[in-house]
């Protein structure tokens, strides 16, 4: 998609062209609009990746092209043949945050064709490079994104996403084999991945509301009529489970809220249903884990009863007995 200096383009037009037809010039224009220069935009990119826990990515330009194509226009302090490098895991993390934080992007990535610069003297008809969308040769029902990418170094790549029966998955295919002879290779592999996930995995609930936690039955209560209060899970969690996996064997890991629980105790009065922490719930047999630790499914830990504050005489007597017990 060419940019003409005599034309004005909106930010939306540039964003649309970048997603729909991999418009490299549009990406550079957006970088300059956001940060003042492409080099400054790279610093924002690196900071964002770091905030997402991605620490080993190589970022040298905004477009994703090899620097050899950019010539003198490559960002300063980057090599003549440098290229962005991210692992499949890194790409999946970026895609996940993009969809979670900006779900409206799927309206763009699911667009099959659109006119760029429609109100200018040089409009261009764009056609989406994602052949898994409706009307294309590799159409797969439910696919609504996300982005293709191709360089000599990275090969033919595709980050796909599909929503089926309310369950969304993200797939990453890098350097698809036999792409030169079969341009559909990356989409064929993506289709296989998607079918495998839905055929072999399903979403299920783990844990139960008000279920006890094996490693944390109760919490001490300071100055209460009772000296402890039982705690439990507030609700079950939904997780993807591989078919045939034992959902009865769970690993529940509690974490108490330090603002409410001091020295492993809460202070009376405390009401039933008060949140005192959170607990992650995992299948004991699940060895795959998650892309990020903060993705582990969790639920609140709540108190199962109300504990009123004890009267002043009871509190005073407890302090006296505690004092003498500490002496011996």
Regions found by a protein language model. Give the residues of each.
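Alpha-helical scaffold elements that line and support the substrate/ligand-binding pocket
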Residues: 14-36, 41-45, 91-94, 279
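A mature extracytoplasmic/lumenal domain signature
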Residues: 5-7, 32-34, 63, 173-175, ...
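Conserved catalytic neighborhood of penicillin-recognizing serine enzymes
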Residues: 1-28, 126-145
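Penicillin-recognizing serine hydrolase domain
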Residues: 36-224
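Electropositive phosphate-/nucleotide-binding environments in soluble metabolic enzymes
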Residues: 8, 24, 39, 85, ...
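Conserved SxxK-family serine transpeptidase/carboxypeptidase catalytic domain
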Residues: 200-328
């Amino acid at each position: 998609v060419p940019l003409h200096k005599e034309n004005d383009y909106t930010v939306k037009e540039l964003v649309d062209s970048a997603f729909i037809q991999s418009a490299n010039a549009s990406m550079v224009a957006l970088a300059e609009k956001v940060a003042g220069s492409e080099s400054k935009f790279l610093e924002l990119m690196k900071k964002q990746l770091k905030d997402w826990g991605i620490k080993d990515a190589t970022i040298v330009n905004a477009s994703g092209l090899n620097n050899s194509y950019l010539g003198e226009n490559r960002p300063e302090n980057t090599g003549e043949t440098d290229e962005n490098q991210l692992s499949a895991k890194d790409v999946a993390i970026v895609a996940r945050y993009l969809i979670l934080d900006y779900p409206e992007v799927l309206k763009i990535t699911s667009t099959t064709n659109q006119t760029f610069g429609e109100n200018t003297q040089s409009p261009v008809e764009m056609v989406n490079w994602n052949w898994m969308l409706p009307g294309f040769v590799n159409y797969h029902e439910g696919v609504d994104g996300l982005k293709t990418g191709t360089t000599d170094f990275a090969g033919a790549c595709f980050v796909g996403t599909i929503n089926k029966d309310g369950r969304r998955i993200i797939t990453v295919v890098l350097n698809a084999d036999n792409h030169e002879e079969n341009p559909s290779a990356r989409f064929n592999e993506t289709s296989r991945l998607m079918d495998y996930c839905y055929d072999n995995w399903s979403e299920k609930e783990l844990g139960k509301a008000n279920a006890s936690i094996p490693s944390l039955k109760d919490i001490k209560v300071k100055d209460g009529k009772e000296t402890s209060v039982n705690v439990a899970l507030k609700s079950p969690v939904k997780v993807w489970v591989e078919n045939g996996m034992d959902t009865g064997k769970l690993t529940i890991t509690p974490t108490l809220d330090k603002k409410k629980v001091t020295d492993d105790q809460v202070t009376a009065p405390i009401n039933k249903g008060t949140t005192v922490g959170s607990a992650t719930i995992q299948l004991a047999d699940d060895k795959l884990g998650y892309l990020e630790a903060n993705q582990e499914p969790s639920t609140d830990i709540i108190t199962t009863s109300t504990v009123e504050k004890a009267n002043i005489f009871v509190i005073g007597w407890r302090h006296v007995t505690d004092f003498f017990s500490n002496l011996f």
